[in-house]
Amino acid sequence: MCIRDRQIDDVVVSFDVLREKFLCNLDACKGECCIEGDAGAPVEFEEIEKLEEVLPVIWDELSPEARAVIDAQGVVYTDEEGDLVTSIVNNKDCVFTCYDEKGCCYCAIEKAYREGKTDFYKPVSCHLYPIRIGDYGPYKAVNYHRWDVCKAAVLLGQKEDVPVYKFLKEPLIRKFGEDWYAELELAAEEMKKQGMI
């Protein structure tokens, strides 16, 4: 693998992914990232089939409103920017969101995965948040997305000294592979030695 600046193979990684701190704090935010925003979570075309396959497993967990949206338009739609995203209820909640007794939002797909009912964790864009993957010419761009609803996660990440890329090790490996992540860690260590991050 070739690393130049902050590039690993055909992936350009924002310095913010390496230097900013982040650690989800569900007790504080209650899973707000799954219910706020103007569109659903980005979905890769290959994930549509997985989302449809998991529906019978999670159907009873979903709200009646979410089931109605899925019946009417499916598990995904194309947003105003032309991207495939998860369907949403009332222009905010992802159709796969559920709530526990404390009012904390959780993903019905992830819950089913943790219970051993499916081998699909959830869309990779959800797993990667607050990282967003975009296109940058012939390259993939790995960017840190700042959002006010995640202030508590930033504070906890700073307190515990957890960089974004370390917090998201598992989903980064899921997306790009073990070797790629090992190169990312090496690049981060070298940049830290040089005082770049």
Locate the predicted segments by residue.
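Short loop/turn segments that flank or connect secondary-structure elements
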Residues: 4-197
